[in-house]
Amino acid sequence: MAQKEEAAVATEAASQNGEDLENLDDPEKLKELIELPPFEIVTGERLPANFFKFQFRNVEYSSGRNKTFLCYVVEAQGKGGQVQASRGYLEDEHAAAHAEEAFFNTILPAFDPALRYNVTWYVSSSPCAACADRIIKTLSKTKNLRLLILVGRLFMWEEPEIQAALKKLKEAGCKLRIMKPQDFEYVWQNFVEQEEGESKAFQPWEDIQENFLYYEEKLADILK
């Protein structure tokens, strides 16, 4: 029974990361997956390619994608026109703090009133209601912040609570967009680890344009 439970835990961990599920009979591989910390915020400059290919894919039904991946670009401009820029990514477990909240807690916990902030997020899925509320509160008290959020998928978009939250984001001045194929390519080139000898070129999946149009229509209906 214990071995079955361990295998189930490992399967869940692997599926969330888009990892290969074929080698879970290997005791060492199983031990490695089980020992991964289950709930944490991970930050870095580039995310693994297999995570991107699985987590950012703009599928209609996102089964197994129980994390949020957030890639960010922060540009802080002073009165002299000089721009300080930074970029990176965060990932979360949905049972812990979400990536959107973690961004304001760890990446940009304070705002210099002498600077103007232009922040762009590329997120695997749109914010939940609680994260939308946190974003709205931050925007309301930080007049020198402009936030653009590009999302691969819409999270639980049929739920009235989520629709209301997305509308409130728009009303608060947050720009919300669906990621186009060109945006996925930008993330691939700027935020994804490239293995030695691997082609830098982005390889779009078969239904990337179709799914973009699907989500773009849904978002337009929600925000109108």
Curated annotation (Swiss-Prot):
Summarize where Zn(2+) binds, as residue positions: E60, H98, C128, C131
Write down the superkingdom of origin: Eukaryota
A Gene Ontology biological process term: cytidine to uridine editing
Q: Where's the CMP/dCMP-type deaminase domain?
A: 64-169
For this UniProt record, the keywords arranged alphabetically read as follows: Hydrolase, Metal-binding, mRNA processing, Zinc
Record-listed E.C. numbers: 3.5.4.36
Q: Name one GO cellular component term.
A: cytoplasm
Name its co-factor(s): Zn(2+)
Q: Which family does it belong to?
A: Belongs to the cytidine and deoxycytidylate deaminase family.
Per its database record, what is this protein's job? Probable C to U editing enzyme whose physiological substrate is not yet known. Does not display detectable apoB mRNA editing. Has a low intrinsic cytidine deaminase activity. May play a role in the epigenetic regulation of gene expression through the process of active DNA demethylation.
Per UniProt, subunit arrangement is: Homotetramer.
This one is known as: C->U-editing enzyme APOBEC-2
